[in-house]
Amino acid sequence: MSKRITRVLFKISGESLSTDSGNRIDEVRLSRLVAELRAVRNCDIETALVIGGGNILRGLAQQKELQINRVSADQMGMLATLINGMAVADALKADDIPCLLTSTLSCPQLADLYTPQKSEEALNQGKIVICTTGTGSPYLTTDTGAALRACELKVDILLKATMHVDGVYNKDPRSFSDAVKYDRISFKDFLAQGLGVMDASAVSLCMDSNIPIRVFSFVKHSLEQAIFDENIGTLIGEEATHVHSS
């Protein structure tokens, strides 16, 4: 990417806040996220954040386990993202980092109702905008919510931080030792191959608005690296597909 990046949106999984020992929101991991968001902000990058809720509850999994209907399960998942967002917002404020916590669901005691206009104003003021509760509608994931926010806020790039893979592969590298990683993959090739690291609906939205997506490992790399180091992860965009050479 040759374009200067001035505004980004990070999609962070809820798992990035939790530990294997069972802490749903771990102090060390939360502190790391806050420190990294500060580092990005110090680079004069306007920053929005969409965080998942998988560390607390996975709607689809809960639907099957508890035999509740899909709409209720997805709404429970949305509330889990709000809990994470509240934790991040309070941690940012405790570190004197200005932020705006938003929700697509109306809960005025907890968060501002999301609007593109209010979020745009906050970004222009140097605040980190935290977007929770996905799209506010069931059957759509936080990936799709992140893509929608990226389009509305006209970010330069959407950066998806994962905990399990370090980019886009032709098949799951955790299951197949011969999986091939892409340095770059075009929107059209990603969709044609039905790759699973990001929802097709999210990729389609970004393709329509020509917003590139970088998928990277939050275990191996920092948020700042994901913005400035073009050699990490995989870039999904308009450029031709290129397989990683080891």
UniProtKB/Swiss-Prot annotation:
Q: What is its EC number?
A: 2.7.4.22
| Positions contributing to ATP binding | K11, I12, S13, G14, G54, R58, T162, Y169, D172
Question: Which SUPFAM superfamilies does the record cross-reference, listed alphabetically?
Answer: Carbamate kinase-like
Q: Which InterPro entries match?
A: AceGlu_kinase-like_sf (IPR036393), Asp/Glu/Uridylate_kinase (IPR001048), Uridylate_kinase (IPR011817), Uridylate_kinase_bac (IPR015963)
List keywords of the entry alphabetically: ATP-binding, Cytoplasm, Kinase, Nucleotide-binding, Pyrimidine biosynthesis, Transferase
Task: Answer whether the UniProt record assigns the keyword Nucleotide-binding to this protein.
Answer: yes
In UniProt terms, what function does this protein have?
Catalyzes the reversible phosphorylation of UMP to UDP.
Biological or metabolic pathway of the protein: Pyrimidine metabolism; CTP biosynthesis via de novo pathway; UDP from UMP (UMPK route): step 1/1
Please cite one Gene Ontology biological process associated with this protein.
'de novo' CTP biosynthetic process
The protein's annotated catalytic reaction(s) are:
UMP + ATP = UDP + ADP
NCBIfam families cross-referenced by the UniProt entry: pyrH_bact
Localization (cell): Cytoplasm
Disulfide linkages recorded for this protein, renumbered to the chain, are none
Task: State the superkingdom.
Answer: Bacteria
What is the name of this protein?
Answer: Uridylate kinase
Q: Which family does it belong to?
A: Belongs to the UMP kinase family.
Instruction: Specify the signal sequence span.
Output: none
Under the subunit heading, UniProt states: Homohexamer.
Q: What Gene Ontology molecular-function terms does this entry list? A: ATP binding; UMP kinase activity
* Cellular component, GO annotation: cytoplasm
Organism ancestry: Bacteria, Pseudomonadati, Chlamydiota, Chlamydiia, Chlamydiales
List positions binding UMP: G53, D74, T135, G136, S137, P138, Y139, L140, T141, T142
Keyword hit for Acetylation: no
